[in-house]
């Protein structure tokens, strides 16, 4: 598994092209699987289940339609994105459901390292925390699979400007809010977070 970490924001359309090409390379066995850590410039994306009324304004940031599962979400500075391109065929026990659950376990264990108690909710796909008596999402999931190879992935709010979510109903869920590591009192940079992400990934995906 190769790891690629970007130091500058990656334009969304370029990231999509890169992932599609990488999936083909993995399928053809000419390129290795990849975990790609990056951030985007501020934007909204609409998954395959997004409804027009969940986009409250299109004047804040660019809006991209994407083939991943899910509804509307936000990407931008302070949010660590992990795009995982993995060949499920190469893992006898790893079906789609187990893959998504293992992604959840990965993020939960990463956050635990920073003393954040969280949980993966399979019904409201994502990783959640209980903050001041209310449930809030700290990590969103959006997955696509082609030729049994995964792409897209997970976005974790590290020091995200949460006001940027105001233009959408995040993931189509009105009842619950959004939070970040910074809001929870954990002030870290990507470099520290990435080290833990890689360490925990290698642990949880050893059985997938």
Curated annotation (Swiss-Prot):
Positions of the BPL/LPL catalytic domain: 29-208
GO MF term set: lipoyl(octanoyl) transferase activity
UniProt binding sites for substrate: 68-75, 140-142, 153-155
GO annotations of cellular component type: cytoplasm
EC numbers, comma separated: 2.3.1.181
Family matches, as Pfam families: LplA-B_cat (PF21948)
InterPro entries (alphabetical): aa-tRNA-synth_II/BPL/LPL (IPR045864), BPL_LPL_catalytic (IPR004143), Octanoyltransferase (IPR000544), Octanoyltransferase_CS (IPR020605)
Compartments it resides in: Cytoplasm
Gene3D superfamilies the UniProt entry points to: Bira Bifunctional Protein, Domain 2 (3.30.930.10)
Role description: Catalyzes the transfer of endogenously produced octanoic acid from octanoyl-acyl-carrier-protein onto the lipoyl domains of lipoate-dependent enzymes. Lipoyl-ACP can also act as a substrate although octanoyl-ACP is likely to be the physiological substrate.
Similarity field: Belongs to the LipB family.
Name of the molecule in the record: Octanoyltransferase
